[in-house]
């Protein structure tokens, strides 16, 4: 199979979207490289290159003899990630200038998770610090699957996003920081349920997610 110029980036983006938004793989499960090659019409070379890139982004892990795996996720892991995310966003809100302006309405066509990630990306951009932008983008990627679980667990998910966006659009820095902290505290209380959901376990299932 001959890979045309640009195939590597196309395969990377396709695999990333698939693994974050479409795949039913659970934490700790193995990535099937031949299946990805068939799915995206690419040879194993760009597929493996894309997977190594995702390992670098901490969206996958690679272990000798086991290949590529969906990262295992424990409650402390997810708690740390939520706390890292709120620290980044509160810092961004504290140092934000007025640009780019944030509309009180999410971009047309965005789903609930995309609308939230768009808001957080815009808050990071307003900090004027490219490292904050990269860090928030990376945290959003790693939190994408947990946010899919949040949609099932938080009926007011979209209302929360609209409230945060409204505060950001109004330029209420103090109120926005307080709302961001409160939002993430609610998520921290849900960590056990989110981790169980990602492992395919119900609240009544006596099994514990693998450590």
Model region roles, listed by residue range:
Residues 71-128, 166-178:
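All-alpha effector-binding/dimerization core of bacterial HTH-type transcriptional repressors
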Residues 84-95, 117-158, 189-192:
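Hydrophobic, amphipathic alpha-helical faces that serve as interaction scaffolds
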């Amino acid at each position: 199979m001959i890979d045309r110029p640009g195939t590597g980036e196309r395969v990377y983006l396709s695999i990333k979207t698939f693994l974050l938004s479409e795949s039913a793989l659970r934490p700790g499960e193995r990535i099937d490289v031949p299946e990805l090659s068939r799915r995206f019409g690419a040879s194993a070379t760009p597929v493996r290159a894309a997977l190594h890139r995702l390992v670098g982004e901490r969206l996958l892990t690679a272990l000798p003899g086991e290949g590529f795996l969906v990262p295992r996720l424990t409650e402390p892991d997810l708690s740390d990630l939520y706390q890292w995310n709120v620290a980044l966003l509160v810092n961004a809100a504290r140092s934000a200038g007025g640009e780019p302006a944030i509309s009180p309405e999410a971009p047309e066509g965005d789903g609930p998770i995309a609308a939230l990630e768009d808001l957080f990306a815009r808050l990071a951009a307003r900090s004027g610090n490219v490292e904050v932008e990269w860090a928030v983008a990376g945290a959003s990627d790693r939190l994408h699957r947990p946010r899919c679980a949040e949609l099932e667990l938080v009926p007011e998910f979209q209302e929360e996003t609209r409230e945060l966006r409204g505060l950001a659009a109004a330029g209420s820095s103090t109120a926005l920081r307080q709302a961001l902290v409160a939002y993430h505290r609610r998520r921290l209380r849900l960590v056990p349920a989110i981790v169980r959901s990602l492992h395919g376990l119900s609240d009544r299932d006596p099994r514990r997610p693998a450590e």
